Amino acid sequence: MEKLLLPILDKTFVENLIPQKAPFVMVDKLLAFCENEITAGLTVPEENIFVSENIFQESGLVEHMAQSVALYTGYQYFLKNEMPPTGYIGSIKSIKIERLPKIDENIETSVSVLQEFMGVTLVDIISKVNEEIIATSQMKTVIAS
């Protein structure tokens, strides 16, 4: 596999970096990546399973945040020519949702890795639409063994 230039807007490529599969994929672009940080994106499609009355629901936004962390891990594994691992949300320490995105809005989510140890990743997450912060969270994700 060759290293790709960022941003990566190929939805199929991005989907292959995470364990989730359609219709449960909540990230569709990898915008930036560096040590301990990633910015992922999602343009909310009308047919998304978490859309109700043209609004992307809380559960979808939380899953988007978690999949942004999974994308960080998956891209790390891609760079090492390894298959991405399966993981899950271990805990959510805090989450604050200011507003929910609408269909066709572009969510940009920045993940800052605070700590990684034995498959557990502690992160701060900020989700924005048009530079407006719509949600923040601190969560732990765990790689399944």
What are these regions (language model features)?
Residues E2-L4, L71, K102-I103, S112-S145:
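HotDog/MaoC-like acyl-thioester-processing domains
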Residues P7-I8, L71-E108:
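Hydrophobic beta-strand-centered segment that forms part of the acyl-chain substrate-binding groove
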Residues G41, E47, L100-S110, A135:
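Terminal leader/tail segments of proteins
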Residues F24-M26, I107-E108, T121:
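Hydrophobic core residues within well-ordered beta-strands of beta-rich domains
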Residues D28-L31, E98, S112-L114:
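Conserved positions in beta-strands of structured domains
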